[in-house]
Amino acid sequence: MQGIETMQKEKVDFNVLCVLSQSNVHKPKEIYKFFRGLGLDFMQFIPLSEFHPDGTPMPFTITPEEYGRFMCEVFELWWPERRKVRVRFFDNLAEALAGQKPGSCTMHETCDSYVVVEYNGDIYPCDFFVDKQWKLGNLNLDSWSEISRRVRRYNFAAKKTLAHPECQVCEYQSICHGGCPKSRHGQNRKFEDLDYFCQAYKMIFAKAVGPLREEVKKLLGHAADLAPHSISPY
């Protein structure tokens, strides 16, 4: 709380990241109102999903339906103040509908938009896959030009293109591109599986795509009135 007060005092834009678990996923209104009461304008909600070796969800893991309901209610709370409050998921969705590349890699066609650098210089393609089999190199030993051209990096990026048959005929495929490989691989260790939160995404898209598409049309029609954001708090 002291950190929030300090950054607000110094007028520093920042994002609050809220992890959704069984302890809070049933309280969307309370959480949203709490953040707004603190004067927070940039929010991000991350669904927690971890599994036992046999594929069963760990106790704190939320269900797709719970995540979908949470975000749909947040959308209703956010919509009246959408011009002054930023919720990352809805920002990314609006970017996709505007034909832009979303800020979140979850909605990208491939997983090659960033890398993770560990304390010792080791580099991995994603913070969910800090694993020996995906290590790309080390900043102390390899140049970035070498690392960026590694076959392993291309192989990882291509994992997202292993679309499940349901994705190929889904009306939202052009938005989520099969979701996050972590959520596809996490339960059964198969990249070609459906994203664990697929049902949630469909619930959210069904709720938000229509209104956001109309909003995007209005904004693009008055582009001269839009103030560009020079710094992303995400």
Please annotate each region the language model reported.
Residues 5-106, 110, 116, 120, ...:
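Radical SAM enzyme [4Fe-4S]-AdoMet core and its adjacent flexible, acidic
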Residues 1-3:
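Domain-scale recognition of functional cores that engage charged ligands
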Residues 130-234:
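Flexible mid-to-C-terminal extensions adjoining Fe-S/redox cofactors in radical SAM and related proteins
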